[in-house]
Amino acid sequence: IYRLCDEYGLYMIDETNMESHGSWDTAHATGDYDYIVPNNKPEWLDMMLDRANSMYQWDKNHPSILIWSCGNESYGGKDIYEMSQFFRREDPTRLVHYEGVFHDRSYNDTSDMESQMYPTVEAIKEFLAKDRSKPFICCEYTHAMGNSCGAMHKYTDLTDTEPLYQGGFI
């Protein structure tokens, strides 16, 4: 798919294989956020950077990659922030994305854009009415769950009226 995107001029977010939202359940149930991984755990950092480097080295020559992503649904914290810094050092020409800062603002500079999953169009408008510091991208905004892709036009219509709304990814 990378070669096809390169050939046809389609943009991609290349996302590190990191997802740990299962660790959130215990944290939310108990209020003890030490359960969340990788978060700020030094023992995870080398593994996280190795994973980022492996993806970067494998994919760095694909012009279709517009954005590096630090992973999916892994909360936030210093370890993921360090991943974002790795991408910035290695490739300052591309943007860095991470949705998890929405849940943990302590490392808000991890992502070059505001990114949320499945917000309503009204929630996007409300957010951008208060915070215009970064462009807004829906890293996931529709699939066959919930309203089964209904009202998708409301998201695409928003790109006509809100210059900081950059669309999204399905």
Predicted segments with their positions:
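Substrate-binding/catalytic cleft of secreted carbohydrate-active enzymes
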Residues: 1-170
